[in-house]
Amino acid sequence: MSTATFTLGIVGARGYTGAALITLLTAHPAIELIFVSSREYHGQPVAAHNPTYCGDLRFETLDPAAVAAKRADVVILALPNGNAAPYVHAIDATAPPTLIIDLSADTRFDPDWYYGLPELTRHTYTGQKRISNPGCYATAMQLAIAPLRDQLAGPPQCFGVSGYSGAGTTPSDKNNQALLRDNLMPYALTDHLHEREVSAQLGIPVEFMPHVAPHFRGITLTANLWLQRPLTREHIKTLYATRYANDPLIDIIDPPPWVNQIAARHTVQIGAFTMAPGNKRVVIVATLDNLLKGAATQALQNLNRALGLDELTAIPYQPNPVPSPIP
C-alpha cells in the first residue's frame, strides 16, 4: 500500500524536462506518480527510459478528456508552447480541484494564473490551483536583475547562451549537433518570448539576445545594468546577498560563475559584479541548469508550496563549487 499523500500525472513526459520531472518525483515522499503521457513512447515501460523509476507504469496516449478523467491531485503539463489549453479546459470542466502546473509559456501572461518564481513571487501565493512555471532564460534574467530593478537608469541588456537541450527534442537547427559544433547560434534577437515575459514581470523593458551553444545543458546569462547613481561593488554584492539570504537555491559568489559547473545542479549562481569606470554600470552573470531550476526543480518548488509541503522537499540541492581563478 502506497503511503503517498498526493497523486500526480505528467503530460508530455518524453522530453528532457519530462525525464527530469520523473527523476525528481520518483524520490518524492509525498507523491504517487499515477500516469505518464507520451504519444511517442505509448505502451513502453517508464523504467526503460528512466533508470531512477522502479515502478510498473507505462507511457500512455491520453487526450485532454482522459487526463481529466484520471482526477489526479496534480497534473504537470510539460508540453510544447501552444498545447496547454485543451488540457486546462478539460480539467477545469471535470476536475477543477486538480492542481495544474504548466511548464509552457501559454499561461505566463494570464493574470488568473499564479506566476511561480518562488524566490521573487512566493509572497503572492495565496493557494492558487493554476500555476505557471517561468521560462528558463526568464528565471535567470529576473534573478539577475531584480535586486537592482528600482535603481536602474535604463533597460537591462542581457546576453544569454543555452545548451541545446533548451531547444527540446523536436529536430531543428537549434539542437542539431552538427550545426552547433564549434559554433554559437544567435536567434530571436529581438522580441524573444522570454524578453516579453521578463519585461511583463519586472514592469520594465528588458533587452535580450539569446544564443545556443554546443553543450547539452546549462544557461549562462550576462546582464549589463546601467545605474541611476554610482554604487560600489561591495554595496551591490551585499544587496544581492541580502535579497537572497533566505533562498537556499541561490548562490551569490564573487567571481563570474561557469556554466560547466551548473549542469545537473538545482541552484542558481549569481556573480561577477564587475563595475565599469565611474561605478554607474555593473555587469552580473547568472548560471542555471535549464532543465532543473529553469524547469523541473522550479515546478517541484511550486508543487511543494501548493501542497503545503516544505518548498525544497525532494530537491537534492547543494552549493555549487566556486570557479577557480583564470591564471
Curated annotation (Swiss-Prot):
It is an enzyme of class 1 (oxidoreductase). It is found in: Cytoplasm. Its main location: cytoplasm. It catalyses: N-acetyl-L-glutamate 5-semialdehyde + phosphate + NADP(+) = N-acetyl-L-glutamyl 5-phosphate + NADPH + H(+). Gene3D superfamilies: Dihydrodipicolinate Reductase, domain 2, NAD(P)-binding Rossmann-like Domain. Its EC number is 1.2.1.38. The keyword Electron transport does not apply. One of its GO terms (biological process) is L-arginine biosynthetic process. The keyword Oxidoreductase applies. Transmembrane segments: none annotated. The active site is at C136. Keywords: Amino-acid biosynthesis, Arginine biosynthesis, Cytoplasm, NADP, Oxidoreductase. GO terms for molecular function: N-acetyl-gamma-glutamyl-phosphate reductase activity; NAD binding; NADP+ binding. GO terms for cellular component: cytoplasm. Pathway: Amino-acid biosynthesis; L-arginine biosynthesis; N(2)-acetyl-L-ornithine from L-glutamate: step 3/4. Belongs to the NAGSA dehydrogenase family. Type 1 subfamily. HAMAP family: ArgC_type1 (MF_00150). Catalyzes the NADPH-dependent reduction of N-acetyl-5-glutamyl phosphate to yield N-acetyl-L-glutamate 5-semialdehyde. This is N-acetyl-gamma-glutamyl-phosphate reductase. The lineage of its organism: Bacteria, Pseudomonadati, Pseudomonadota, Gammaproteobacteria, Lysobacterales. The gene is argC.
